[in-house]
Amino acid sequence: LHISPSVNLKFSKDAYLIVEGSLTAIGGEANIITFKAMSDSWKGIYVLNANNKSHLKNVSISNITALEDGLLTLTGGVTFYKSDADFENVKISDIKAEDVINIVESNFSLKSVFINNTNSDAIDSDFSKGEVLDSEFLNIGGDALDFSGSDVSIKQIKASNVKDKAVSAGEKSTLNI
């Protein structure tokens, strides 16, 4: 799925975006791409089983609740499952899900990511490999960065008003900070 610069996507309360494949949303500095709710909230983004890498650049995402729909239940507001992803200059705010971004069994790069106002964890990486660079986490209800079985490099992050831990690592994770 390719989304053009300046596109402003508004989702209804029970709506969500599922992409079986890669997601490319590359905006410009002056013409960002926006994913937001029509009213209070929407159920987020789920990218799965992509053969090609997803790219999100100059993107704003807001007002997500957890995705629960019948048999489909996800902990992340934005979830990448077996789908490599690069995020650059992405702002995510006002998320009411267990994880803002949940990356599972994927390679990733998060550069200049700003996450604000969450009720739980900001980034949750499960059995993945990647990097978090030049990013900021503000008003986080759980951990800013939570790693399980992951191999991650972390450089120049700022975490403020984090309720639990700035960085949490378990299940044989390897971190380079």
Task: List where the protein language model places each region.
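Beta-strand/loop edge motif enriched in small/polar residues
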Residues: 1-177
